[in-house]
């Protein structure tokens, strides 16, 4: 039998050996029919059985979120021109009056925003692929935007406000030419320069009293939106050294007014200067030469040179005692502030108040001019105490109401902290120089 197998071709012998091995494996290792019919091979309906799956073969998406399709908008920005209404602007943007009507009739906020447009305001229009208005935006401030969105029921609106935080900043300067230039050099805005002058305007005449070498320091707020500075806030503490005298002003958060370290009001009953600080032609001098006659004539007041038409302010609350004209004073206004004080304003271009009228401190009572006996346009200002002429720059002025009681205690504690911060910032600045 073996000799017969050996006489077979080589390929046949290999195939016979392979098939024989398969048959032997099947006999000894595969289950028989009885094993297949055993209960553990059967599955009951409704029963859960553990199943092992290869994680590589089965993929399970992790919380897949299907977002609604977003609408890509084409944005166009339009700036309101002088004298342009919402209707004209919408027409320029290619929108019909019907769209404007739909917007303004949707709610009062939309109507108010579109009816109060001012020159240089910007409107942003968002159009879809069919050129239909989907969204409208109006920037109210760097941190607030009015947003209108089309919905199934018409237009809806909301005020999108960004969170505003505050940080402190510091500035200082020494005056070398004039106060305004010193403020600019210190990095202050025009509003801050004016605010600083207003804070100390009851103690310092910024038109006459400023000298080379005067200096100031201030601590002020900066508005922060999304990490960027978008504007300036209040000045919270400041010092001003004028001709060797130091003045201090600190903001009271409750009243919004400024006081010194002891809670005394910076505001006085009278302003030192009845107009914006400008170049002046003469100081208080009771024995000056008259500009026309050349004779010695008492010059019981102060002359302020400024552009014709500059607003002139009432130095304090009072009643207009006289508003008239004569060949010497030109247009003039006298104001009685009490039985003690009278202020006079001469050579006005225009008088804006009448005799008997009540006026408030800072109210415009006229404009600077050159009427009457003058060599050039200017304001002549006089300050009388019990009928006697006083230098308005140096006369002691009555104070406005100061803080008392608990309000004073709270303010003094806060004032101490703010002045300490002011000094720390000053020291840090010098340490880094």
Curated annotation (Swiss-Prot):
It comes from the Bacteria. Binds 1 zinc ion per subunit. GO terms for cellular component: plasma membrane. InterPro entries: Cell_wall_metabolism_enzyme (IPR050570), Csd3_N2 (IPR045834), Dup_hybrid_motif (IPR011055), OapA_N (IPR013731), Peptidase_M23 (IPR016047). One of its GO terms (molecular function) is metalloendopeptidase activity. This is Peptidoglycan DD-endopeptidase ShyC. Zn(2+) binds at residues 299, 303, 380. The chain crosses the membrane at residues 10-30. Disruption phenotype: Grows as wild-type in LB medium. Synthetically lethal with shyA. ShyC shyB double deletion mutant has no growth or shape defect in LB medium. Its EC number is 3.4.24.-. It is a single-pass membrane protein. Cell wall peptidoglycan (PG) DD-endopeptidase. Hydrolyzes peptide cross-links which covalently connect adjacent PG strands probably to allow insertion of new glycans and thus cell wall expansion. Degrades purified whole PG sacculi in vitro. The gene is shyC. Belongs to the peptidase M23B family. It is found in: Cell inner membrane. Its cofactor is Zn(2+). It is an enzyme of class 3 (hydrolase). Keywords: Cell inner membrane, Cell membrane, Cell wall biogenesis/degradation, Hydrolase, Membrane, Metal-binding, Metalloprotease, Protease, Transmembrane, Transmembrane helix, Zinc. The keyword Metal-binding applies.
